[in-house]
A protein has these predicted regions:
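Structured secondary-structure scaffolds
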Residues: 1-46, 98-102, 168-400, 444-446
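Short, glycine-/Ser/Thr-/acidic-enriched flexible segments
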Residues: 10-11, 148-150, 177, 234, ...
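Helix-rich, typically C-terminal accessory recognition domains appended to large enzymatic cores
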Residues: 366, 374-412, 422-524, 614
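Intrinsic disorder at enzyme termini
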Residues: 499-558
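Phosphate-backbone binding interfaces of nucleic-acid-interacting proteins
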Residues: 545-656
């Protein structure tokens, strides 16, 4: 059997945060590391998703080219993953020629089979930006849950897949203009043709996670609709049809093909260009996609349908999608910069402390919450005081009283045999949890073992028996060394850096997962070190304060639409000496805006002034008067000063 493991391709428009890690990456790495210890044929494939609207939006907001954006974040993401201990066999990019060729081949094969067809449709068009708007360039309210900030393809609040025309109060994400509906042509994937096959296939997946099956069956019950797979953009994989000039493949069609192109790249690096076919075309391949729950519909319905349409390819064996990880009671939000970014974390803390916390609190079946206080408690109480304490007390005792030579024993008492029996059963018991993607429970079993080990050490009192009965002391320390040796392997999938330190300290004799129930113990230990230093309250206080006093991202700032305006009329609001009601021309429209500038300006002197307006501010009533926008001003010691332009500018121009 071959095992092909993938993690969802991260968008190369920003760094990775803890929510991403907990969802699609850490669980996969644990699983792959375990399979390697079982000496199984497994490869782990990933890469950055470098096409799509998130990239072009970031580029426009940062005044850069899409290539500049993806080049930067590919390196940043790859380095962060490596520092976190991720062990991809290949980490590719969807902008590589190998991927473009594969994606176009996929399109052409499915098109020639009749599963892709053209269709003239209406699409939103921004008259100010002078272009058709891809779905993520449109924002508005979700028609299902009412959340603001829903995109034209999906609502992040309720995970509902949306169509742009379903949005309530749609606007252009870049300029805030209300878009128009215009006709254009796109190519559609005939997803509806695979409804029966998908139903039959899903019916065989009784072992999948309950929430994954529930989500998929819900979509199937509602009926599958054909999906557009092209976009009016220049950034992406060009559609390989003459009549589709100027269009690219939709990222949801393009991205999963990246799993194949990344595997091809891996095979070429191995010097065997056809090796990838042994994984993708073999019925003996077990293909597992690790994703977050927001990607279920793409990986469990659309992607399998694409593979069915092409033919020959293996279908996913399992899709153990995780639920969401929240942060201090709120959702992670990249747009609001409410997140703990992996590069920032790794500057302050060790990777294994986070790997432990995210696995211990993994959102495997329900949403969970990450808090800095929990992180500190788990690190100090469970890693330092439990695991680290047992390893340290065992090794330092041997080093101090046996000159680093590990005692041996051939006969054991009842308590010794009890611990050895726990060791003997550990590989199979923990392995079963990992095979079923129950990583949290697998880690829990290991930590129970370390608790038992500490109790064993305390009960046997080697500091006493060293003097009263040296043979019992030697036996105790021999058992302790067997435990430490086993832990150095059992912990490797979860805490690889810690496991590596332990192996170095005990001069580890190489052995696989199945052998560590009765491990070989090295005769002499090496230099020892404390595995985990405790984290002080002040360090955690600083991290908590960073979330409260966070900087906003360029994406978040980009949501504020600033435009030039010209004040046409102005008058004092009745009953107020400070509020002035202004009629402001913004391009072809006029807005009523109330500003608290009456102490510095007389109403009449404002008429004709060019001002800077926040155009997309939610309307509000001020002293009972509707205000639809905001005038920007500087708050100086001498009073408020309205901001204007250095040179004459027409109203309605975008301010960057």
């Amino acid at each position: 059997m071959k095992i092909l493991v993938t993690s969802a391709l991260p968008y190369a428009n920003g760094n990775i945060h803890l929510g991403h890690i907990a969802g699609a990456y850490l669980p996969a790495d644990i699983y792959v590391r375990y399979q390697r210890l079982k000496n199984r044929d497994v490869i782990y494939i990933c890469g950055t998703d470098e096409h799509g609207v998130p990239v072009t939006i970031s580029a426009e907001q940062q005044n850069k080219t899409p290539k500049e954006i993806v080049d930067h974040y590919y390196g940043s993401i790859k380095n962060s993953f490596e520092d976190f201990g991720m062990t991809f066999d290949n980490f590719s990019r969807t902008t590589l020629p190998i991927h473009h060729h594969m994606a176009q081949d996929f399109f052409s094969k499915i098109y020639n089979k009749g599963y892709i067809y053209p269709k003239e449709i209406k699409q939103y068009y921004c008259p100010r930006c002078n272009r058709f708007l891809p779905d993520r360039y449109i924002t508005g309210k979700c028609p299902r849950c009412g959340a603001d900030g829903a995109k034209g393809d999906q609502c992040d609040s309720c995970s509902r897949w949306l169509e742009p025309f379903e949005l309530v109060e749609p606007k252009c994400l870049i300029c805030g203009e209300v878009p128009q509906k215009r006709r254009t042509k796109h190519w559609y994937f005939k997803l509806s043709a695979f409804a029966d096959k998908l139903n039959e296939w899903i019916a065989t997946k009784t072992n999948w996670k309950e929430h994954v099956l529930s989500f998929v069956k819900g979509w199937l019950r509602e009926g599958l609709q054909d999906r557009p797979i092209t976009r009016d953009m220049s950034w992406g994989v060009p559609v390989p049809l003459e009549q589709a000039n100027g269009k690219v493949l939709y990222v949801w069609f393009d991205a999963p093909i990246g799993y194949i192109s990344s595997t091809i790249e891996w095979a070429e690096k191995k010097g065997d260009p056809d090796l990838w076919k042994e994984y993708w075309f073999s019925k003996d391949t077990k293909m597992i996609h690790f994703i977050g729950k927001d990607n279920i519909v793409f990986h469990a319905l659309i992607w399998p349908a694409m593979l069915m349409a092409y033919g020959d390819y293996v279908l996913p064996s399992d899709i153990p999608a995780n639920q969401f990880l929240n942060l201090e009671g709120d959702k992670f939000s990249t747009s609001k910069n409410y997140a703990i970014w992996l590069p920032d974390y790794l500057r302050d803390f060790k990777a294994d402390s986070l790997r432990y916390a995210l696995t211990r609190n993994a959102p495997e079946a329900r949403d969970t919450d990450f808090t800095w206080r929990d992180f500190q408690a788990w690190h100090n109480n469970e890693l330092a005081d439990n695991l680290g304490n047992f390893v340290n007390r065992s090794l330092t005792f041997i080093k101090k009283y046996y000159g680093s030579s590990v005692p041996t024993a051939s006969t054991f008492a009842e308590n010794d045999n009890r611990m050895l029996d726990i060791l003997h059963k550990a590989p199979a018991g923990i392995g079963e949890k990992l095979e079923q993607f129950e990583f949290k429970n697998g880690l829990r079993e290991i930590m129970k073992m370390t608790q038992e080990a500490n109790r064993y050490f305390d009960h046997e009192e080697p500091w006493v028996t060293r003097k009263t009965n040296p043979l019992i002391c030697e036996r105790t320390m021999y058992v302790c060394m067997k435990i430490v040796t086993s832990l150095s392997v059992l912990l490797e999938p979860f805490l690889p850096f810690t496991a590596a330190k332990m192996k170095k300290m005990i001069n580890f004799i190489p052995q696989q997962w199945d052998a560590i129930g009765a491990p070989d113990v090295a005769p002499i230990i090496g230099d020892t070190e404390i595995l985990f230093q405790k984290i002080d309250d002040k360090v955690i206080d600083l991290q908590v304060s960073k979330l409260k006093k966070r900087e906003i991202s360029i994406e978040e700032f980009g949501k504020v639409v600033l435009k030039t305006g010209k004040i046409l009329e102005a008058e004092i609001v009745e009953g107020s000496s400070n509020l002035i009601k202004c009629t402001v021309e913004i391009g072809d429209t006029q807005r009523q805006i109330v500003a608290g500038i009456g102490k510095e300006y007389k109403a009449q002197e404002l008429i004709g002034k060019t001002v800077i307006v926040v155009e997309n501010l939610k309307p509000a009533k001020v002293r009972g008067v509707l205000s639809n926008g905001m005038l920007l001003a500087a708050d100086t010691k001498e009073g408020i000063v309205l901001l204007t332009t250095d040179k004459p500018v027409a109203s309605g121009e975008i301010v960057r």
